């Protein structure tokens, strides 16, 4: 792939990411993390982390610090919350390009950065932004410097790699070091440079790594180690430092404190099939053909592939796992599969596979219009037919088929599907209609209200129904159960606003089908107590 065409595609995907950054935040995680970061700005407290009114001991501070700095510079809104994460995704794409150029060749390198930024899971990570966006970018960054050190043996590359690896650790803990370490071990084995591990410079790198963690260690010590009386997930006397270095990752492996999401040993393997779209199908076939022909001759690719399989297997052992946990492996996945994808460009099987992928995205593009704009589905279908005809007439490469499919689908997602879907987050609806200068709003549902907290830049006070019996001139947020109880105790309560609510991150077929959607919705209300 040529540099000029790569730039055009990157600009197209840059516009796509920008559109996603303008949308409201999704609950729970994105909105929750935005509230946690904005609280740092509002209270000018960058040391303590809180989830609502409770001390937060889960993911370390760096993601929240970056978001808070962005909000301090550009204001408290969804765009500024997403900005550091999206920028680091593009930084990650750049360092994937640099690493691929180091390991393979320039042609593969230009394509690799595009493969990374156009992967379906990375696009979603830039919109439904959690800690994984920052983590993935930093992991790609650290891998490049450490790979350069293995190839060139320059001390500055080792120290840069250790510093950035520390930042990755300060974002989500031990998993970052496991992934970075897996790549480093694979390259050490490929180049037979195991002696690098036993140099004095390795000790210096360890010191730099620990130095980069000092802000997080200090914050954890202040919030938790000095306050053993704090209770987190039912346990007191929690050490933040011990949690960071040991407990966090092993709690997820065992499911302790987080619950269990299933024992499917192939969870991340089948998650990969959609997460690495539009390149998963052609990548698997390409890697298979590489394996059949000269796999044993390509030592770097061989070792990276083994490292990827081992890391996937290790992550699959966890009792608590979610699809976006795969994101941290995307830099390595890109390094493994980009040469395999390019291998098919000049082969007969490559273009049919890319057209099949385009058709899959085309069908998905039509389907996401149906739930909210069924009349537009026909127009989208006709547009895709015309686009297919144009691509066929111009005899474009398989790469253009792949990138066109993912670009069209996600443009429709960010301009058609998600804007309507997010209307079913009642907090967003209420935030447009309430004026808290008139009176206080309290939460009687005992459910999180992250988007309202973010919009009004405060944690809504929680009140029980019994506490509200004698309250006056106050707004109360209720669901159907608390509404009925409140009306019995306060017949004078007046409905101020109502909105339909759905947990939009857990889509179901019943919700997506317009005729059955009403059965999946709950009604939430804002009540005025005179």
Which ranges hold each PLM region?
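Transmembrane-lumen/periplasm boundary regions of multi-pass, lipid-linked membrane glycan transferases
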Residues: 176-298, 307-339, 353-372
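Short acidic/glycine- and proline-prone juxtamembrane loop motifs at membrane-interface regions
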Residues: 121-135
């Amino acid at each position: 792939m040529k540099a000029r065409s790569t730039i055009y595609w990157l600009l197209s995907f840059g516009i796509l990411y920008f559109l996603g950054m303008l949308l409201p935040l999704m609950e729970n995680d994105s909105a929750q993390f935005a509230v946690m970061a904005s609280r740092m700005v509002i209270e000018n407290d960058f040391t303590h982390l809180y989830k609502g009114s409770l001390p937060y001991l889960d993911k370390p501070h760096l993601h929240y610090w970056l978001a808070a700095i962005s909000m301090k510079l550009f204001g408290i809104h969804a765009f500024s919350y997403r900005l550091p994460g999206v920028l680091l995704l593009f930084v990650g794409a750049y360092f994937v390009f640099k690493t691929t150029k180091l390991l393979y060749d320039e042609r593969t390198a230009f394509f690799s950065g595009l493969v990374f930024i156009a992967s379906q899971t990375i696009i979603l990570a830039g919109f439904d932004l959690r800690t994984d966006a920052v983590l993935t970018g930093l992991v790609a960054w650290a891998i490049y410097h450490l790979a350069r050190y293995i190839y060139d043996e320059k001390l500055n590359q080792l120290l840069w790699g250790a510093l950035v690896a520390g930042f990755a650790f300060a974002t989500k803990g031990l998993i970052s070091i496991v992934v970075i370490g897996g790549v480093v071990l694979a390259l050490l084995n490929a180049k037979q440079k195991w002696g690098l591990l036993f140099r004095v410079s390795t000790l210096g790198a360890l010191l730099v790594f620990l130095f980069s963690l000092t802000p997080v260690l200090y914050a954890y010590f202040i919030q938790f180690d000095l306050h053993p009386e704090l209770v987190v997930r039912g346990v007191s006397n929690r050490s933040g430092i011990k949690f960071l270095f040991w407990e966090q990752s092993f709690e997820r492996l065992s499911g302790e404190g987080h619950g269990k999401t299933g024992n499917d040993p192939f969870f991340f393997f089948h998650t990969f099939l959609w997460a690495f779209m539009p390149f998963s199908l052609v990548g698997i076939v390409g890697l298979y053909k590489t394996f059949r022909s000269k796999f044993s001759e390509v030592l770097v690719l061989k070792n990276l592939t083994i490292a990827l399989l081992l890391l996937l297997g290790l992550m699959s052992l966890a009792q608590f796992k979610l699809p976006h946990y795969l994101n941290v492996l995307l830099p390595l996945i890109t390094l493994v599969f980009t040469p395999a994808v390019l291998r098919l460009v000049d082969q007969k099987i490559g273009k049919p596979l890319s057209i099949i992928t385009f058709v899959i995205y085309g069908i998905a593009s039509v389907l996401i219009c149906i739930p909210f704009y069924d009349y537009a589905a026909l127009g989208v279908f006709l547009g895709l037919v015309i686009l297919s005809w144009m691509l066929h007439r111009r005899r474009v490469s398989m790469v253009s088929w792949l990138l066109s499919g993912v670009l069209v689908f996600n443009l429709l997602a960010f301009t058609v599907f998600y804007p309507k879907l997010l209307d079913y987050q009642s907090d967003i609806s209420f935030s447009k209609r309430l004026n808290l200068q008139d009176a206080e709003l309290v939460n009687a549902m005992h459910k999180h209200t992250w988007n309202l907290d973010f919009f009004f830049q405060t944690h809504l006070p929680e009140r029980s129904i019994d506490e509200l019996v004698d309250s006056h001139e106050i707004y109360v947020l209720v669901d159907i159960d608390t509404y009925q109880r409140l009306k019995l105790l306060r017949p004078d309560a007046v409905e101020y606003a109502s909105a339909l609510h759905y947990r939009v991150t857990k889509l179901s077929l019943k919700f997506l089908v317009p005729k059955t959607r009403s059965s999946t919705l709950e009604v939430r209300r804002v009540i005025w107590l005179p």
